[in-house]
Amino acid sequence: MNTKLIAIPSILVLSAAGIAACSNPDEKPSADGSASTSQTANLSFDTSSIQAVPEIEALVPESIKKAGVLKNGASIDYAPAEFFKSDGTTPTGYDVNMADAIARVMGLKGATTEHAEFATIIPSLGSKFDISISGFTITADREKEVNMVSFIETGTAFAVAKGNPKNFDPTHVCGTTVGVQNGTFQFDYITQLSNDCTAKGEKAVKIMPHDLQTDIAVRVASGQYDATLADSPVIGYTIEQ
């Protein structure tokens, strides 16, 4: 789960990959103004040596013990947190590794990570999935529905097409077209910004929601959207590719 802090935007950074980080409303800018990508360096971790903790193992529900695995639900389109390997079927990423590590501490064989549209994950907890580690931001509304635990602190960043051809200004988003993933913190955040625009008598943000973040990146790079808004490690990883 992610904990987010609102901060100030950073400056434009160009990349060779078709899109560029344009701002980061949730983290302070780095010294050179670029989005931090150090978090994207290690995409997998060998959890096989992790041992069960007896005190925790004793608390595991019998139904999960019987299954022998922890069922994790995730939107597997959010690299480097969760995405498919080149075979197109094997999930990987730091959220996937975390689920497997937790399972081993619980005395299980490991975790399985199954894809689900992000907005459907929380309603599926307790029935289809035992747990979800899928880039969630902890919010008061979500805590009314499920128990949430923070294990990583990230920011949120805008990204634009290389060279910022539409002159997107992250400090003035009124009247722009922004792609965001359904059900995310970023969807709520850009909606808040859009409402602020209309309250000031300016044009609303044209919000373009999608189930997959990867679909949004393609549209930003091709010029269909002015920008996208996503977790900063996701923006950083996309730029590196």
Residue ranges and their predicted role:
Residues M1-P9:
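Bacterial N-terminal signal peptides that target proteins for export
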Residues L5, G18-S34:
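Bacterial lipoprotein signal-peptidase II cleavage site
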Residues D32-S132:
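Extracytoplasmic small-molecule ligand-binding "clamshell" domains
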Residues L70-A74, T171-D188:
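Short loop->beta-strand "edge-of-pocket" segments that line small-molecule binding or catalytic clefts
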Residues S86, A140-T154, N195-K200, T238-Q241:
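Ligand-binding "clamshell"
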Residues A99-K109, Q186-P209, E240:
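Ligand-binding cleft/hinge of the Venus flytrap
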Residues A111-T171:
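Acidic, polar ligand-binding/catalytic clefts
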Residues F136-E143, T191-Q192, A221-Q241:
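A ligand-binding cleft/hinge motif common to bilobed small-molecule-binding domains
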